[in-house]
Amino acid sequence: MDNSRKYLLNFKGCNFERTLVDMKILEKLDDFEIRDDDVFVITYPKSGTVWTQQILSLIYFEGHRNRTEKWDTLDRVPFLEYNIRKVDIENRPSPRLFASHLPYYLAPKSLKNNKAKIIYVYRNPKDVLISFFHFSNMVVKLEASNTLENFMEKFLDGKVVGSIWFDHIRGWYEHKNDFNILFMMYEDMKKDLRSSILKISSFLEKDLSEEEVDAIVRQATFENMKFIPQANYNNILSNEIGRRHNEGAFLRKGAVGDWKHHMTVEQSERFDRIFQEEMKDFPLKFIWDLNDEANSNHSAK
């Protein structure tokens, strides 16, 4: 039985979580006024969003870097369409930092051909699938799946928040010339966090000292974030979103290649065939396992 409509709201072809999405914002997205110094982290769900929010916050806020201020990262870098904390996003002081799962075609019109910056983080979709599967089974506001096979069908059909992964990444990449955008690969960030932070800060035109970069790297490692209440989203999970059970955390593993521990050979090969068809001639590389990186550009094996 398909219960997706109970959990999802479809707006102009894209699925959103029904109870958390701010419809007033969605309906006014076209006319949302973008400032030149706005910065957006845009991802498909379960692709490093919270991690990149933490990095952005650390780059921009000295009080975060030196731990003199104890704001939640979600308050520093709120979601545009999921305004859970009811932030006055239009009147926030500059520079405004936002996170979003929006597809390219729902982005505010004035974000095109604008100085405002977008950091698009993408992750190999097999690990996205596994992370999304566990997350959906943990939170009450998403439809649980009894098996990975069941969730994989929904994921490939786009019956999940964010709709179809292939459409999301292709849409943003194929329209990259309309935006001031930097593409970052999750797996590269896992391999070399310091270099990734320097690349992001250079794109943002933020000149950081060695000490500041060191502080950002320390506080932005996935392992450390899991134990920082302001960064790990566990309080949001327990309060605004809600858990089905007490096992697990918002930040689960963040591992590269975790799909190998969950997908059967048949599921993996079936996913490979779909990936090769959907992503043929797509220029961005993908890393499926850090141990097999040399053979991992476009093959989903």
Swiss-Prot record:
Reactions this protein catalyses: a primary amine + 3'-phosphoadenylyl sulfate = a sulfamate + adenosine 3',5'-bisphosphate + 2 H(+)
Location in the cell: Cytoplasm
Known tissue expression: Expressed in male liver.
Q: Where does 3'-phosphoadenylyl sulfate bind?
A: 46-51, 123, 131, 186, 220-225, 252-254
The active-site annotation reads 101 (proton acceptor)
| Entry keywords, A to Z | Cytoplasm, Transferase
Name the Pfam families for this protein.
Sulfotransfer_1
Q: Which Gene Ontology terms cover its molecular function?
A: amine sulfotransferase activity
The UniProt record lists the EC number as: 2.8.2.3
Q: What is its main location?
A: cytoplasm
Where is it found, in Gene Ontology cellular component terms? cytoplasm
Instruction: State its role.
Output: Sulfotransferase that utilizes 3'-phospho-5'-adenylyl sulfate (PAPS) as sulfonate donor to catalyze the N-sulfonation of amines (PTHP, aniline, 4-chloroaniline, 2-naphthylamine).
**PANTHER family given for it?**
SULFOTRANSFERASE SULT
Tell me the protein family, please: Belongs to the sulfotransferase 1 family.
Q: What is this protein called?
A: Amine sulfotransferase
Organism of origin? Oryctolagus cuniculus (Rabbit)
